[in-house]
């Protein structure tokens, strides 16, 4: 599939620690480095980082998460890369809604930890079908 060169690769990470401790900073820096490395290794163009620190995965009002949704809905994103799926959402229904948004806007989801690329994985097909029945 040919990607539009003007579209971004959204690199999203979230740290739920509310403190500004050294551990939180290390976790954030580590996630960002892994996302950047993954994007580079997979030839994903125009990386843009979206990060939420100190927010629960059940909270869909996270500032960077809302910005991510806005650029997805504006068809400015070709790929979303996360370290693991729980960084996006911890709630089943919120995760399903996000996957439907990604599918509607032809965005490829990459999860490094789960080794997932795309929405054609069996787990996603089942999840996307769940709300239709």
What are these regions (language model features)?
Residues 1-133:
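Short, structured surface patches at the beginning of a domain
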């Amino acid at each position: 599939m040919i990607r539009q060169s003007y579209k971004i690769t959204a690199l999203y990470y979230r740290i739920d620690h509310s403190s500004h401790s050294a551990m939180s900073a290390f976790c954030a820096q580590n996630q960002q480095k892994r996302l950047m490395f993954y994007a580079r290794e997979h030839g994903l163009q125009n990386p843009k980082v979206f990060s939420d620190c100190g927010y629960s995965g059940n909270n869909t009002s996270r500032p960077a998460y809302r910005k991510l949704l806005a650029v997805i809905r504006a068809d400015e994103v070709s790929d979303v890369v996360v370290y693991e799926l729980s960084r996006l959402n911890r709630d089943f229904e919120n995760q399903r809604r996000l996957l439907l948004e990604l599918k509607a806007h032809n965005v490829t989801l990459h999860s490094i930890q789960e080794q997932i690329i795309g929405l054609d994985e069996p787990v996603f097909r089942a999840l996307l079908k769940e709300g239709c029945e």
